[in-house]
Design a protein with these regions (language model features):
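Transmembrane helical cores of multi-pass secondary ion antiporters/exchangers
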Residues: 1-432
Length: 432
């Protein structure tokens, strides 16, 4: 497809999505299903007007998926409730690390014993398919910074962290595939645990939390000086994302976790500096903070601004990323060439691995059975899985294995968008 054709197609989809926003919100399916259907219709499965080869275009696809993830992770982070409370974050922390690890292990066992993949490839497939997606899960995400829905909070917070917590398993699988001398496994595992797991997480927390809090304080100080300084919130947020991700990556910490923690720290620090009042649950009210800002500005007092413009801007970029990448997904898939193992892997992941991992991970957390069941079902796979797939390709997968993992992964992502996309609205409405 020509450049003009791409502009025309994406422009028409954007117009249609914009005009049909109310219709789609009332329909039983998500916007991602619409984009996927258009991609499949125009792609190699039907009209064959375009084909996007993830193997040949892995570098471009990696960049697009990475940008979409970073924007989505930042948007999720600034919606987290303030102040941070370990008891409230207990469930998502368990989901992001305990349930994530169990999901990787279960998928790896299935791939090893049923699909007969090598151990390294089995772990790699588990790392690719285990993380839930922050980009495509907008219908079950926290809708705004003051949203107190427990299900949405758990799912959003989990998705914000588990893209980073899955990365060590992708590295472990790749390391095992490229390991020539199996006698040195203990040394490699020790290095993996100390650097790729422990330091990656701790470094991300330190870098992201420190940078987010520092930017919030700098912005607040600039706003309280006279004459008052205007701040371009969108550029500040994008700059924070870029700096935090690059610094974390340079020191081998998790860039995805660092960006999420930076957004959380930014919002936490801003609301505390603004003196936002607390509700009966002890959470600060961002809307009340905005009202106070308006009153202060009207009386020329010191403005204690907590800006929402950057969040709005990121959500617009998030929608554009979703449209583009899901459309490309449709162009990557040929329904006639999907591996036969795809349905088995998807069924095992959706019905066995994810629910079981969530149930075990939340044992003793005080989370009710109904809530655990809902969380166990809502785990859409999407852009994060695409990123880790093409990351593995860039790391040098053997061609035959790359083709097999690509077919399985893209097929599972497609089925996840369809199955979870059709079930999310009825189940969310039923849970209210």
């Amino acid at each position: 497809m020509s450049t003009n054709g791409w502009f025309l197609l994406i422009g028409m989809l954007m117009l249609a999505r914009g005009f049909a926003a109310t219709t789609i919100s009332r329909s039983p399916f998500t916007s991602a299903i619409v984009y996927l259907a258009v991609g499949i219709l125009l792609g190699p499965s039907c009209l064959n007007l375009f084909r996007f080869d993830p193997t040949k275009e892995s570098a471009l696809l990696e960049m697009l998926a990475q940008a979409a993830l970073l924007i989505s992770l930042f948007s999720a982070g600034v919606k987290m409730p303030v102040p941070f409370n370990l008891a409230r974050w207990n469930a998502p922390l368990r989901l992001a690390w305990v349930s994530m690890t169990l999901t990787v292990g279960l998928v790896a066992l299935f791939a090893y014993y049923v699909l007969h993949l090598p151990a390294g490839a089995a772990i790699l497939l588990g790392g690719i398919l285990a993380p839930t997606d922050p980009v495509l899960a907008t219908d079950v995400q926290v809708r705004h910074a003051g949203d107190k829905d427990e299900l949405r909070f758990n799912l959003t917070c989990e998705a914000g962290m588990n893209d980073g917590s899955a990365f060590p398993f992708v590295l472990l699988g790749l390391g095992m595939l490229h390991m020539d001398d199996m006698s040195d496994v203990a040394t490699h595992l020790a290095q993996w645990l100390s650097v790729d797991v422990l330091w990656s997480t701790a470094g991300a927390l330190l870098i992201g939390g420190g940078c987010g809090a520092a930017v919030a304080r700098i912005g607040w100080q600039l706003r309280v000086v006279k004459p008052r300084h205007e701040i371009m919130d969108d550029l500040v947020a994008l700059g924070l994302i870029a700096i935090v991700f690059s610094v974390a990556s340079l020191v081998k910490a998790s860039g995805f976790l660092a960006v999420f923690f930076a957004a959380v720290a930014l919002r936490q620090t801003e609301l505390k500096l603004a003196g936002a009042p607390k509700d009966r649950h002890g959470l600060r009210e961002p809307e009340l903070a905005k009202s106070q800002v308006a009153q202060d500005s009207a009386t020329n007092d010191v403005p204690q601004v907590v800006s929402a413009e950057s969040l709005v801007f990121k959500e617009h970029l998030e929608r554009l990323s979703e449209l583009t990448l899901v459309l490309l997904l449709g162009g990557m898939i040929s329904l006639r060439e999907l591996p036969y193992e795809t349905i088995g892997v998807a069924a095992f992941l959706f019905v066995v691995a994810r629910p079981l991992a969530v149930y075990v991970g939340l044992m003793g957390s005080g989370t009710g059975k109904r809530m655990r069941g809902m969380i166990g079902w809502f785990g859409v796979r999407g852009i994060g899985s695409i990123f880790y797939l093409v990351f593995a390709m860039q790391a040098g997968l053997p061609p035959a294995l790359a083709k097999q993992l690509t077919g399985i992964s893209l097929g599972v992502i497609m089925l996840s968008i369809l199955v979870h996309g059709f079930s999310v609205k009825p189940l969310i409405d039923d849970a209210k």
